[in-house]
């Protein structure tokens, strides 16, 4: 039956943490797409994925035109969008990061040389607020693509695993993640021998990690992270099996798609004979710009020699040149343990670190690793300046914001500047996740923090350079980090020699090594543990021993980089005089209304009088920010006077202000929110003892008067008497004469 609905199910057993059920469905929704599938998590979260393919290939392209889009629908969480037009607009950061999580394992799974446009659209249609939809979307996208009749070597299973109370838990909820030491998304596919090939990892420690480790939890060291990858494999296997079951029932037969190979063997053979010695020599030049200039010259020489024979095949010559370059680079690494720039496999390029790189800003640092140069700049402000989020996530605000900019001049090119691309958003998010575990709490440091990483020069891992620059910049701004964090990019090259696969891990990879290697992974962390990890591989599985050794190699490099950074700055500096001063005061919750006042009158008055900026939290915590500390202290004193008053005592004297007059006396404000009555009989003393008919003849509103507390009744009402200097002299005699 053409529109028959098919189902498959994957049950994830988390032991003491219960089970999660991922159910796949096809045939009911989006039937005109080449392939469509719905993935449900516990029948409470629903993601629809539709995969479409263009009828004709884009043969003029030299890359595979795959597009992945994630559409967050606010109705999924029972919300109306907060924008002016009340409809969804540009994708959120969560949606963009999920696009990248889907793209990274999907792209290498299509047949090499495919040039038909492929689009995968994942729509979040229902969401339990305690669920995370990103891994559900990975599985839905894989399932819909598997059904579409495309040359695709799936299925791909995606799982989030979190280390909670010593156990790796799959598909954890937001609530469970509150107790997680480490959290990672792992995607992979099942090989013919039954093993799981890990294709992609995105992992991070949490903002609770340090506290949990101090409480006795296991720290996320390299060994623990490697164990987590192994723990994810059985879950991936279950998910792939369910997708394969669905595909067996409903997948279209694989269609005929033209494959455009980058080049034919005859071009590569001719090119090798023409320029291999010159190319080999060019690849030994250490400097990036000099090397690229020589490579361009050799490429021009190759075209000059080959074009007469291969007329009209310029693209093939260019692609073959790249393939030969890749082959020579890899061969040298495997055989000689030497790299493009002459380094050994574990060598790090020259490092440089400095703080206070630019004037006036709240904190800044410059970090250089070879030709990679990153400027980190920190800005501090009131907590009300933290980012407000209108997304499907239950997280509605973000105090630490990390933005990453990659201008075209960083690689010596021209190009568009302006709004960030997906890559920039992804790199910024990776650097942000690396830093979050070591940030002080809101209570310890009540500031909104914006960190900007400017990639001023790029030749290998600007994202990990951003982590290093950010650590130093934050310390320079006076942020009391729990530990410094550094990051390093690693690569892996493998080659089969005499039937045995040899692996070589490379520390601190160049941009070219990233492109020519089999795996690249970025590791950030403190001296004690890993805070963030990103891994992508083109291999069908990496032996656990190789991965463990590569992670240890990365740790050695990270410790060396931390030593260099700590020479530049090892403790938080004094805060910049240009940064706002923020202090906190805690008041009883039932006093919040008094501090705000009717229609905000009191809080507005305090802000106007002191020049401070005041933010009140629901729990009674008040954050007071001002350009100068004295302004913040003045606001704190006023607030304490209202909400945390020191009860006046009999006999205390105050210079008060008349705030109201009546027929029987004047009310005098002694402290904010604390008034007393100066009775008309006492006001006579201020009038020389004469009878007072009208209080305002002696004291008007706003008048200052020195008073003493004469009595406090059972209800806390204050009775005042005036303090008159030298009142025992002539005034008393004059009073007697009048009588």
Swiss-Prot record:
Enzyme's top EC category:
transferase
Q: Which InterPro entries match?
A: ExoRNase_PH_dom1, ExoRNase_PH_dom2_sf, GPSI/PNP, KH_dom, KH_dom_type_1, KH_dom_type_1_sf, NA-bd_OB-fold, PNPase
The answer to keyword Ubl conjugation applying to this record is no
* GO CC terms, sorted: cytosol
- Enzyme Commission numbers on file: 2.7.7.8
Provide the binding site for Mg(2+): 514, 520
- Highest taxon listed in the record's lineage: Bacteria
**Which residue numbers delimit the S1 motif domain?**
651-723
Any one biological process term the GO annotation gives: mRNA catabolic process
Q: Which protein is depicted?
A: Polyribonucleotide nucleotidyltransferase
């Amino acid at each position: 039956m053409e529109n028959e609905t098919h189902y498959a199910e994957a049950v994830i057993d988390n032991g003491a943490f219960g089970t999660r059920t991922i159910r796949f469905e096809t045939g009911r929704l989006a039937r005109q797409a080449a392939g469509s599938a719905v993935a449900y998590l516990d029948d409470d979260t629903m993601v629809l994925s539709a995969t479409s393919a263009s009828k004709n290939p884009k043969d003029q392209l030299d890359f595979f035109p795959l597009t992945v889009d994630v559409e967050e629908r606010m109705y999924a969480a029972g919300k109306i969008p907060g924008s002016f037009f009340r409809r969804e607009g540009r994708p959120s950061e969560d949606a963009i990061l999920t696009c990248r999580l889907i793209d990274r394992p999907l792209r290498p799974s299509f047949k090499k040389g495919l040039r038909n446009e492929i689009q995968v659209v994942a729509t979040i249609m229902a969401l339990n607020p305690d669920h995370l939809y990103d891994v559900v979307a990975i599985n839905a996208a894989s399932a819909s693509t598997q059904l579409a009749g495309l040359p695709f070597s799936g299925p791909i299973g995606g799982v989030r695993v979190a280390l909670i109370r010593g156990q790796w838990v799959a598909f954890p909820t937001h609530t469970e993640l509150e107790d997680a030491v480490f959290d990672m998304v792992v995607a992979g596919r099942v090989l013919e021998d039954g093993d799981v090939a890990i294709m992609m990892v995105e992992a991070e420690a949490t903002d609770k990690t340090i506290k949990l480790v101090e409480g006795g939890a296991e720290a996320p060291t390299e060994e623990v992270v490697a164990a987590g990858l192994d723990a994810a494999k059985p879950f991936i296997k279950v998910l792939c099996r369910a997708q394969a079951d669905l595909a067996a029932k409903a997948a279209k037969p694989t269609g005929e798609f033209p494959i455009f190979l980058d080049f034919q063997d005859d071009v590569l053979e001719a090119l090798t004979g023409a320029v291999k010695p010159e190319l080999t020599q060019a690849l030994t030049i250490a400097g990036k710009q000099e090397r690229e200039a020589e490579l361009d010259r050799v490429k021009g020489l190759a075209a000059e020699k080959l074009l007469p024979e291969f007329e009209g095949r310029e693209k093939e010559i260019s692609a073959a040149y790249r393939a030969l370059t890749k082959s020579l680079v890899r061969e040298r690494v495997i055989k000689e343990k030497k790299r493009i720039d002459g380094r050994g496999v574990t060598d790090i390029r020259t490092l440089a670190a400095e703080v206070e790189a630019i004037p006036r800003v709240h904190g800044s640092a410059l970090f250089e690793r070879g030709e990679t140069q990153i400027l980190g700049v920190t800005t501090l402000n009131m907590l009300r300046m933290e980012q407000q989020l209108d997304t499907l996530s239950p997280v509605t605000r973000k105090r630490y914001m990390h933005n990453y900019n990659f201008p075209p001049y960083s690689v010596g090119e021209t190009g568009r500047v302006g709004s960030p691309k997906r890559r920039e958003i992804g790199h910024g998010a990776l650097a942000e996740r690396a830093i979050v575990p070591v940030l002080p709490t809101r209570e310890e440091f009540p500031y909104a923090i914006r960190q900007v990483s400017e990639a001023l020069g790029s030749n290998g891992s600007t994202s990990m350079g951003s982590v290093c620059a950010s650590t130093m910049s934050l310390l320079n701004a006076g942020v009391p980090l729990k530990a410094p964090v550094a990051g390093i990019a690693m690569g892996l090259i493998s080659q089969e020699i005499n039937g045995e696969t040899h692996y070589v891990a490379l520390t601190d990879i160049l941009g070219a090594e990233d492109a020519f290697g089999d795996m690249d992974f970025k590791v950030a962390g403190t001296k004690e543990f890993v805070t963030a990890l990103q891994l992508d591989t083109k291999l069908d599985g990496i032996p656990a021993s190789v991965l463990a050794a590569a992670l240890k190699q990365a740790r050695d490099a990270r410790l060396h980089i931390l030593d260099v950074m700590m020479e530049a700055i090892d403790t938080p500096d004094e805060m910049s005089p240009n940064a706002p001063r923020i202090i906190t005061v805690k008041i009883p919750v039932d006093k919040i209304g008094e501090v705000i006042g009717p229609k905000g009158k009191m809080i507005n008055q305090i802000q106007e009088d002191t020049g401070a900026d005041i933010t009140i939290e629901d729990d009674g915590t008040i954050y007071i920010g001002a350009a100068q500390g004295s302004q913040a202290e003045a606001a704190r004193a006023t607030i304490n006077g209202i909400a945390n008053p020191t009860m006046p005592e009999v006999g205390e004297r105050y210079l008060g202000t008349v705030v109201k007059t009546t027929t029987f006396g004047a009310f005098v404000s002694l402290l904010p929110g604390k008034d007393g009555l100066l009775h008309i009989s006492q006001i006579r003393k201020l009038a020389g003892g004469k009878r007072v008919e009208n209080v305002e003849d002696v004291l008007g509103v706003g008048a200052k008067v020195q008073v003493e507390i004469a009595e406090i009744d059972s209800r806390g009402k204050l009775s005042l008497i005036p303090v008159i200097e030298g009142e025992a002299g002539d005034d008393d005699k004059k009073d007697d004469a009048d009588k």
